[in-house]
Amino acid sequence: GGRGGAASSDHPGLVELLAWIVDSGRGVGISSLRADRVALKPDIPRLLRAGGYSTLTVASDAAAQRLRREIQKGTTEAHLLACAEAAREHRYRVLKVYMMVGVPGETADDIEELVSFTRRLAAIHPVALGVAPFVAKVHTPLDGLPFAGIKVVESRLARLRQGLRGARAELRPTSARWAWVEHRLAQGGPAEGEAVLRAVETGGSFAAWKAALGESRLR
């Protein structure tokens, strides 16, 4: 079987390649897809299902449409709704949607929009919401932007958990604490490199990382 990542959905010959793989009797899967590509090319979810894939995985990027525009992501609610319809039509087990919380400028209203929209998706087909705290990556357009903070991210996740109760939606969050560690390392320098060694030497727990990174901040 073959497997690709999100960039695979940008390949101009993807549909033809998937058809060739499926027609030859092989299995195929793509770890995640751009939602707009799935919406605009309905053969993609059909062929992936024929290739034995049972989870249709797409990226939503941010909690609200306004935020997706601000971080220049082309995904719209219409694209995501089309993905849910495709997951239902081709009998996928679940639609998995990756998205971020804690994007700079995000408000409580944006989280409410995410709750209501996820419930709309879940009314069409079961949803697994993979939620990761926003961490600015070096050498990307969002490099240098701040981390929302552990307490803010945890409150966002708690609201999502509460708001999705009773819906066909499972919340699969990434730890706010470990996202903070990732942020410090992504935006750090040599002092953070030394902190990695100290954290590992002192057991590697979050408390060890927090202490080690706290020391590096004081240097």
Task: For every predicted segment, state its role.
Residues G1-A128:
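Conserved SAM/AdoMet-binding glycine-rich loop
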Residues R88, V103, I111-R219:
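Auxiliary Fe-S-binding modules of radical SAM enzymes
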